[in-house]
């Protein structure tokens, strides 16, 4: 009996510590509070991830990046209705691309019937040193956006062209000749 009492006395502190440690695991842990800048960057990353995984999904089903861009254009072009001039389309694109931290745009040339502008490629860093993320290359990502914007421009009655000039996308939007 004396041995049992000694064992209880010896193990009681260990049992108490184990019980208290279990209670501590039930404490609520704080969740991270992101700054506005962190929220902005995270939101933009998620938009890019959705587009990238959409391209990947299309490819995994035997479709091309062009098919994906056309699908997105057909789906979303009606939301661009109300845009009447090339300048209006540029303004809409500018609003969308401002979502990307580090985005810059410069006007090159403008007239009543056409605009030419360029914007940088801040999304490029998402693709890392190998230029690919989630099975999609930066080239495919840009091709998908080019096809999408071409589809939207045609839907609105414009010609659209896009080319790379080092780290800039150079875009021209013109009224179609009637």
Question: For each of these PLM feature ranges, what is it?
Answer:
Residues 1-8:
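Bacterial N-terminal signal peptides that target proteins for export
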Residues 9-13:
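Hydrophobic helical h-region of N-terminal Sec-dependent signal peptides
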Residues 21-144, 151-155, 159-178:
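N-terminal accessory segment detector
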Residues 16-18:
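N-terminal signal peptide c-region/cleavage motif recognized by signal peptidases
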